[in-house]
Each structure stands twice: as C-alpha cells, then as structure tokens.
Amino acid sequence: GFNVYPRDVEDALTEHPQVRMAGVVGMPSDRHGEEVVAFVALEPGAQMSAPELIEWARERIGGYRYPREVHVVDAVPLTPVGKIDRKALRTRLRESSR
C-alpha cells in the first residue's frame, strides 16, 4: 500500500470554507491494509453531507489519499495540548462499526 499522511488529508479538508476542523485515521481494510477515514466538524450553520465532502476531497487530493468514509461530528476531539486525539477517533470508529 501507499503511505497517507493524516495531516495532508486534514489540510485538504479544512481548505473547504464550510469545514472548521478535520481529523483523519486509518481503518483496517482487507483490500488495502487501511482505508482513510475522516471526522469533520463543520462551521456553524454549514450544511454539507458526508458524500459531498468525500467527492470534494477526491477532486482535491485524488488517488488513494481521499477519505473513503467521512463522519460529520459536532467537534473533533483534542488532546490536553490541543492536538487531534487520533486514539479517541479510532475508538469512535471501532464503536460505530459494531
């Protein structure tokens, strides 16, 4: 597989004017090893759907790097030092796939 850097995908997603913050993690995949999954917090009043965000990202970063799954959330969890809490995102992903 290819290396995908979460920060690259997060930066691309947050270029969208309706996206306030994005956090990206890998989800285990039988086909590719891992799939890119994004958690996105929208700006107040924004109305974007997950499929619209996936398509927008695919047009921007394309190839294997765009997220195959997007979860629109109220807030992207942060660590006490203000970084994206990827462990919390992976936990949410596991819980949502049960």
Language-model segments: residues:
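AMP-binding/adenylate-forming catalytic core of the ANL superfamily
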Residues: G1-R65, A75, G82-T91
